[in-house]
Amino acid sequence: MADFFASSFWTGFLWPLIVMIAQSVLLLVVLLVAIAYILLADRKIWAAVQIRRGPNVVGPWGLFQSFADLLKFVLKEPIIPAGANKGVFLLAPLVSCVLALAAWAVIPTNLGWAIADINVGILFIFAISSLSIYGIIMAGWSSNSKYPFLAALRSAAQMVSYEVSIGFVIITVLLCAGTLNLSAVVEAQHARGLASLIGLPQLTILNWYVWPLFPMFVVFYVSALAETNRPPFDLVEAESELVAGFMVEYGSTPYLLFMLGEYVAITTMCALATILFLGGWLPPIDLPPFNWVPGVIWFALKLFFMFFLIAMAKAIVPRYRYDQLMRLGWKVFLPLSLVMVVIVAGVLHFAGIAPK
């Protein structure tokens, strides 16, 4: 009996726990290395637009610049302002970073490649992205300074404005896919769509939701910029107005955690756009040599394409005024996304093509 309970404990609890921890550590390492090079790519793209070289000294072509920056931040001493609430001040960057990383627990980068392939994966990511505002509000309030506090208030209003639009975008995709499971959303873009209707099922690129839902793709792209405080919606950390926004009192490792959380959140939005609109890990053409390439490579290429679009917005679009930002969210995107939900639902119902 004792042997039975011991074996049940090992196979039913301990071994799955060890596997999950190993998967989490592997994902964390891969994600952090990817973020280092995404940050470098962001700086390189910005430099190319401005006809500069960008980071090119540390390592060949500047490939180790992000690791040099990491070492610099870690070796600096964190300074806490005299009037700050020390506990909340130090907890804020940790909250921001951990919540951003937690979203990747449900994101599949290939078929079956997810730590937790839950049936409500989209809702989980939506909830995590909504909670990320708390790290910024904690930082703004605990710094005991007017610039971070004003940035925190801006951030709260900005994220509430664009969360609603992103929610309606997700609803339109769910109507087409018929599921909240992220892997099932990708598989739905392989099984049915325009390519199947015209008798060319190998052209999976025609099944991607970016084509029938292109207005919602644009809304998602712009809302993702606002959600992650990226230019031209970087009013939370506007250098010309608020110095560095909610991070003005931060330095050393806490500042590094905020930057890490910001770029992980950007990467999460790119991954979500890849899954919802660009077919996830599916090749554009389901024929050799395209389907010889591993799905995770296609996923990474599409993710970087989305990041390139976000980086280009930083380089070429001027910053919006705060009232313009609010007007765009509430008077343009919210009505547009709501109308699109009604149109998509009507077309699916009356055409008889709604998923069963």
Curated annotation (Swiss-Prot):
A GO MF label: quinone binding
Single Gene Ontology BP annotation: aerobic respiration
Compartment(s) of residence: Cell inner membrane
Membrane topology term: Multi-pass membrane protein
GO cellular component terms, A-Z: plasma membrane
PROSITE patterns in alphabetical order: COMPLEX1_ND1_2 (PS00668)
EC number assigned by the record: 7.1.1.-
Main location: membrane
Record field: transmembrane: 18-38, 87-107, 120-140, 166-186, 205-225, 265-285, 292-312, 333-353
InterPro entries: NADH_UbQ_OxRdtase_su1/FPO, NADH_UbQ_OxRdtase_su1_CS
Reactions the enzyme catalyzes: a quinone + NADH + 5 H(+)(in) = a quinol + NAD(+) + 4 H(+)(out)
Keywords of this entry: Cell inner membrane, Cell membrane, Membrane, NAD, Quinone, Translocase, Transmembrane, Transmembrane helix, Ubiquinone
Top-rank lineage group of the source organism: Bacteria
Family: Belongs to the complex I subunit 1 family.
Protein role: NDH-1 shuttles electrons from NADH, via FMN and iron-sulfur (Fe-S) centers, to quinones in the respiratory chain. The immediate electron acceptor for the enzyme in this species is believed to be ubiquinone. Couples the redox reaction to proton translocation (for every two electrons transferred, four hydrogen ions are translocated across the cytoplasmic membrane), and thus conserves the redox energy in a proton gradient. This subunit may bind ubiquinone.
The protein's assembly and partners: NDH-1 is composed of 14 different subunits. Subunits NuoA, H, J, K, L, M, N constitute the membrane sector of the complex.
Name of the protein in its database record: NADH-quinone oxidoreductase subunit H
Originating species: Bradyrhizobium sp. (strain BTAi1 / ATCC BAA-1182)
Gene responsible for this protein: nuoH
